[in-house]
């Protein structure tokens, strides 16, 4: 599966399976205006695209969801323990009303 970086429409035309609609030349011209020589343009693209893909893989939604769920469960357990520990004042238990401080 091929993943693309999110870009504004004015920055560069839409890419289809790694090939640009209007040709390869246009993207290079846009970056040369910023003061990059043609040799550095390819290195610049490679390093920045690689970096963004690496970050995206590390922080997937599924992984964040799993971590969040795990923390939530452990917090809920702690809250229950604190309520059970104070058996005398069960009616006035404030921990149920309060949200978990970790988030």
Curated annotation (Swiss-Prot):
GO molecular function: DNA binding
UniProt modified residues of type Phosphoserine: 8, 10, 37
Any one Gene Ontology cellular component term annotated for this protein: nucleus
Post-translation changes: Proteolytic processing into mature chains is required for histone eviction during spermatogenesis. Transition proteins (TNP1 and TNP2) are required for processing.
Chain spans, region Disordered: 1-103
Function: Protamines substitute for histones in the chromatin of sperm during the haploid phase of spermatogenesis. They compact sperm DNA into a highly condensed, stable and inactive complex.
Compositional bias of kind Basic and acidic residues: 8-17, 39-48
InterPro entries on file: PRM2
Assembly behavior: Interacts with TDRP.
Annotated localization: Nucleus; Chromosome
Low complexity bias spans: 23-35
Record family assignment: Belongs to the protamine P2 family.
Keywords: Chromosome, Developmental protein, Differentiation, DNA condensation, DNA-binding, Nucleosome core, Nucleus, Phosphoprotein, Spermatogenesis
Name of the protein in question: Protamine-2
Biological processes annotated in GO: chromosome condensation; nucleus organization; spermatid development; spermatogenesis
Pfam families xrefs: Protamine_P2
Bias kind Basic residues: ranges: 51-103
Tissue: Testis.
Residue stretches in coiled coil: none
């Amino acid at each position: 599966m091929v993943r693309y970086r999110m870009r504004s429409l004015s920055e560069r035309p839409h890419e289809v399976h790694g090939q640009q609609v209007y040709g390869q030349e246009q993207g290079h011209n846009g970056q040369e205006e910023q003061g990059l020589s043609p040799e550095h343009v390819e290195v610049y693209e490679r390093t920045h695209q690689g970096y963004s893909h690496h970050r995206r893989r590390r922080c997937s939604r599924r992984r964040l969801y799993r971590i969040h769920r795990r923390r939530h469960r452990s917090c809920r357990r702690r809250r229950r323990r604190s309520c059970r520990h104070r058996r005398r004042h069960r009616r006035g238990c404030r921990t149920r009303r309060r949200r978990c401080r970790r988030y």
